[in-house]
Amino acid sequence: QVIRERIHHSGATAAYVAALGSVPYLYMIGSFMTDGHLTLKLFDFDRDKKIFHPLDAPPTNANIVKLYNNQLINDSKCVPANNEGAIGLAISFTMEILERDLPTEFVGHTLHVQLNTGFRFDNLPEEEEQEKIVKKLSYIIAELKKQADEVHLFISAQASVIVRLGSLYQEGLHGAINVWHWNS
């Protein structure tokens, strides 16, 4: 009974989440919040001050840029699945994930996305802008899923982006997702 009461919080209107951890762990935390009955309020960690803070900075006017074979593309349909029916999505917001950093089976089979504002920590510090960008990522995953049996994610982004992306996971839309812990 006590556990049930702590899980459901019928009077709650928002879920406040501050988390640090590996990329797969953060994605998993977000995926536990997919029912959408609570507004999600995410926090990021300030490495200098050593505290969590809300996403209340001014927007950066960021937009997603898609690349395949180092060429700008508009349509992800040009990215083929590998022989195992898998396709990769490299999300480079904090640091750039290069083709040579990927497992060999994903070289030539991975869409690279980044922000037009460059690479840096806490690249999306404003809540609404982050929501908009992450919804676009979710749409890209769904597009890639149409071309493959599985989508593999390689992510270099702030924790809140990863949690938010996990919260948008829908099995019917995204299918099997494999989240890799990418290290630079």
Model features per residue range: what roles?
Residues 143-184:
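C-terminal functional regions that serve as terminal interaction/effector modules
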Residues 2-8, 129-147, 161:
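A short, acidic, amphipathic alpha-helical segment used as a generic capping/interface helix at domain edges
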Residues 63-139:
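Redox- and metal-dependent alpha/beta enzyme cores, enriched for Fe-S-associated oxidoreductases
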Residues 32-35, 103-110, 167-171:
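Short, solvent-exposed amphipathic alpha-helical segments in soluble enzyme
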Residues 6-13, 79-85, 143-148:
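Flexible, charged surface loops at secondary-structure boundaries
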Residues 38-68, 118-124, 176-184:
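Long, charge-dense
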Residues 18-22, 90-95, 154-158:
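Structural motif
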Residues 10-58, 161-162:
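Hydrophobic, ordered structural segments
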